[in-house]
Amino acid sequence: MGSDLPTLPASPDRLLRVRKLAKRYVRGGVWGKRVPVIAVDGVDLEIAGGQTLALVGESGSGKSTVARCVARLEKPDSGQIWIGEKDVGDLSSSSRLPLRSAVQMVFQDPVTSMNPRFTAVEVVEEPLLIQGLDRERRRKVALESIDEVGLLRAWADRSVMQFSGGQRQRLAIARALMLRPKLLVLDEAITGLDLSAQAQIANLLQALQTSHSLTYLLISHDLALVTRMADAIAVMAGGRIVETGPTSQMMMAPKEQETIRLLASARAAQSRLGALTEASA
């Protein structure tokens, strides 16, 4: 990973390319002994511009670590992350500013990334502070983004804590769009919402993908959401990608045992949820 951003062979149809990505942590063990943990071990993946890749796997498989490395919230130990033709895997803090514009992340719980003392418009306009825009211009652009995600401008000066979970996720998406990114990393961004809100946010993300030519890296364990949104699926286990392919192929004819087991487990969980929902109706 070079800090001088080497120009690589053109790949106009691939917005994100990850090669041999590795990340390790050191955690406390028995008797205070430090134990190395391999979170990501030589991951390769790529996403064509305007497409959605779903990265799936059990808890602890390494998928969220990959997401955080792509967004540069974590520094990889080795490997390359290319956005377009640039290797951005080892950027310094000062060189990372352009990447923040190109790649934005939307988390599962938006409250953790929002100042509870801020109003909705202040939360959304926050990324523009680093751009040096004046307050009037920031507010204008933020209000336009609030409109675009389906919230009312009349609510712009309410505290973010007055919004529901689904509405706060809309605000998080509006904020992510402020720097006109090319790639959105969606880390369980719809998990935890009720079914109605999940469907609405999924519809919104698909509409925004079309209108803004966005590319998505979708981290999810929700089989229905993955089937609906993803063009391709990559399955992780033990820090590695064990299988990848088009969504229809992966759902209908998975080849690896880990994929077969994961899909069977997800389908069983959905069947139980459906039965509980029907019983409580």
Regions found by a protein language model. Give the residues of each.
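Conserved catalytic motifs of ABC-family nucleotide-binding domains
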Residues: R180
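Helix-to-loop junction immediately C-terminal to a conserved catalytic motif
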Residues: A71
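Conserved ABC ATPase "signature" region
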Residues: D87, R137-A154, L263-A264
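ABC ATPase "signature
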Residues: T244-G245
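Conserved ABC ATPase signature
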Residues: S159-F163, Q167
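ABC ATPase NBD coupling module
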Residues: V30-V35, V88-Q104, F118, E122, ...
